[in-house]
């Protein structure tokens, strides 16, 4: 199984998020991937649309302060993740009605549905760790957040 920490670098972790709503959030997380050089800027609109289309089906705010917007992109060689932390919470229309503090955007290759399921499975196992969302919410740097994830995997 792929460890989530192996798909994250400090360059794809944004603390604090600046977005004030879900639309701004998707734009911000896609920009994080572009700034890190893992997603070409020419694919910005496509990546945002993939997240928005998934969100229209059902909120990816899974509850407990966590949101997992995700989707599959054509012509992607490997999975891409971007982690954003909103210490004060962000309105997200989560399933429990509460704001989210931790958002992990996940893009997987359209040609590899197994990778998509595998990563979502690994993420769900990781976030079963009691108190992880609140501890991530308290992180002040991307280094601190990545180290916490590595310790808990």
Question: What label would you give each PLM region?
Answer:
Residues 1-153:
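Cytosolic covalent-transfer regions centered on His/Cys nucleophiles
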């Amino acid at each position: 199984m792929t460890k989530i920490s192996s798909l994250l670098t400090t360059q794809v972790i944004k603390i604090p998020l600046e977005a004030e709503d879900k639309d701004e959030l998707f734009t911000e997380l896609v920009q994080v991937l572009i700034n890190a050089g893992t997603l070409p800027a020419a694919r910005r609109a496509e990546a945002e649309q993939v997240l928005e289309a998934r969100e229209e089906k059902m909120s990816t705010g899974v509850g407990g302060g966590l949101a997992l917007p995700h989707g599959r992109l054509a012509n992607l060689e490997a999975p891409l993740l971007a982690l954003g932390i909103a210490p004060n919470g962000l309105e997200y229309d989560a399933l429990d009605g509460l704001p989210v503090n931790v958002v992990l955007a996940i893009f997987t290759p359209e040609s590899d549905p197994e990778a998509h399921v595998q990563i979502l499975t690994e993420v769900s196992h990781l976030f079963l760790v009691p108190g992880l969302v609140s501890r991530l919410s308290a992180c002040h740097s991307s280094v601190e957040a990545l180290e916490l994830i590595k310790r808990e995997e």
